[in-house]
């Protein structure tokens, strides 16, 4: 994976106008790794690549803001990209979930799955369904639509265990009211916000 130059980044920024955050992340990773298919990576592997690209572009340190959900106070916070990279082997392939009398073969979600699931109101369940390769109950094949809700709950938790990089949250604290909360950190949206600010600044100079 390489770090694209300034001219390439400006061109990418210009032609990505109007695209969704996921599509923008895919364009960026395709530019950095033209030989691969970034949309086919698990969400964790995709985000790990985005974290590393962010460090190459802007360095390891970052800052952000959030509004306290309790009192509305603006909270400023900062961190280090390297602290958000999960240690351990990046997993791919087929996994097996044993849930009571059910045996589920599944893979980890990727960006294709996220884009497909976005079309449904209950996108979380559709995302899980897309990743089930085979479902059996007492050695007989069964339809994914017939699986009970608790099996989907177990599958959701198991996917989170297998791909922890896919769900990064920051523990924030409000200095005004002392409220603490966890806020999801979406590296794709954050990185593109930085690229957008950088591109506009370059064009003004």
What is each residue range found by the language model?
Residues 1-205:
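Long C-terminal interaction/binding lobes of large macromolecular proteins
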